[in-house]
Amino acid sequence: MIQIKAVFNGNFDLLENIRVSPFSRAYTFSDSVYEVLPFFSKKLIALERHIERLQRSVDAINITLDIKKVTDEINQLLSASDFDNGYVYYQVTRGQDLIRSHMYSDKMDIETFGYITPCSFETKKLNVMICEDTRWGRCDIKSTSLLANVLNMNNAKSFACDEIIMHKDGILTEAGASNLFFIKNETVCTPSLSNNILPGITRSILINALSNKGIKVFEGDFNYLELKTATSAWLTS
């Protein structure tokens, strides 16, 4: 049996021993953000970029976070892990609220939770469904509020699709859990960053890598119908 290492509010234990209060605002309001950090051969990929994005997320929802402590906990999880390849999931919640209210207290104690799990990383062909982007207006924040993604992706699953590609009023945004790239007229294209798109770490790494090879990436607004004439398309996550 695989034993998953975890940390909750600074206390390290096995994942099966972690206990979270039902009064956590992560449960009642999805009042939380998260980050997913991949690692290969026990080495975290783009740690600083992931930490910077987590910092932007907590800043956006007015949570003060000891980012050095978070980084230390992530590294400790990796050091204690038996897995060579996988990812670290780390979540920050505003805290517990015994009286359910949309308005939160400034004196709440934040809750942090992380765990590490094995994962095989591979490139594979996908069947995708194109659908309307029905998510909220701040998808640039890596929020745990993912119900629209869940519903749309499970609808796609019922049609034997692996992923969704979303558009807002006809303009491409992103996939359910990844960023979109495609080639058209021998040009690499990807939707511009906006409130409707999460600034993917792999997205930025790929754009930089292509630029270093002299391959320009065109970022812009694209109608979803343009995918029909694309030479190829891929998702990054």
Where in the sequence are the language-model features?
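Ordered, amphipathic secondary-structure segments that act as subunit-interaction surfaces
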Residues: 83-92, 99
